[in-house]
Amino acid sequence: MKDYQISQELSLLGEFSKKVRHYLHTIPEVSGAEYKTSAYCRKMMQSFGYLVVEYPGFTGFHADLNIAGNIKRVAFRADMDGLEMPDLTESEYRSVHENMAHNCGHDSHMAIALTAARFLAENQHTLNCNVRFIFQMAEEDMRVPGAEKMVEGGCISGVDEIYALHNDASMEVGSVKINDGIMSSWGAAWTLDIGGISAHGSTPQKGLDAIREAVRIIDDLDYIVAKKTSPFSPAVFGCGMIHGGTVPNAVPDYVQARGTIRSMDEETDSVLKNHLASIITESTLRGFRTTMVSTGYPAVINHKEAFQRVIQSASCFLQRIDSHCKPMTGSEDFSYMVNAVPDRKGALFFLGSGCAEKGINNYLHSNPYYLDDDCLLVGAQIFINLVTR
């Protein structure tokens, strides 16, 4: 039984929100190439009467509902990209795109935004602020920082406050998690390229073994996290991919490895980056052609006033609110948008999208990934309350 109550007016959009999510779930697209998704959302926002602003060369866009000139503007972010993995869900609306799935639930983020946007447009006579919905490309791939590109393109221009949510199917529908500080880690994706010298496997002294050097560097990176950072400041290092060598009886002359590194404070982030640079320098002095490219996101840090506004907007109809949750070790490029708003007035919160009774209790990026459609109106109600209460 539900322990929350959606407004009667918003409840009328329940079927609309489900239909939107189910369609978007069928067409997940890779980061930066969300063409069908973007076109669908743009057409929908235009039909509601929003002024749509596109970004040449990018799939992201924002849409404005303008009430008056000299009043504040509140913005909401919805990310659009899917993940490169098969959709293993058993539903009539499973992905029709091979090896693509919405296993991070961005389909729900867009459905929530579109539902809230429709409601606000139909009830704009009750608003006392301007509204912007930002449909962001490329949140998943740290090599293509979609939020940063959109900020550079002007998506935050004129914005006074900004909010975003992320679904979490390990939490029950009707619950929210947030805090008034760090919500996500400083995170970076790294790509390590090592060039050595090939030689016959019987004469290893004549070559420079790129695989052995990769193992040494990866081990050193693990050591940095374990021994060069404070035990009171968590950090996580991971290597998820290694490719190298061509035949079994030769010294390999090239290796590429890729992974991520994350931390929970800016000082630790700086320590990690400085040690990474010294490791690469040491490798080149050993004769290897070694480079490391690192791209990542700063942490999302919730503004205290924006945090309070989320609490107020959720607590008026929800009972299960954790206002002191621990930050996630994952990273979010929503930080670029928050940092671009005056006084950094913005907040990210987690929205329960699971349901134990329905057997929905899974983690982001797991496969299959299910979420409960009942979360859609809960998220939309919070967004609506943020601009109407």
Where are these regions (language model features)?
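Histidine/acidic-residue-rich, glycine-tolerant segments that coordinate divalent metal ions
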Residues: 62, 83, 91-101, 108, ...
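Non-cysteine beta-strand/loop elements that form the S-adenosyl-L-methionine
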Residues: 75-77, 86, 190, 347-353
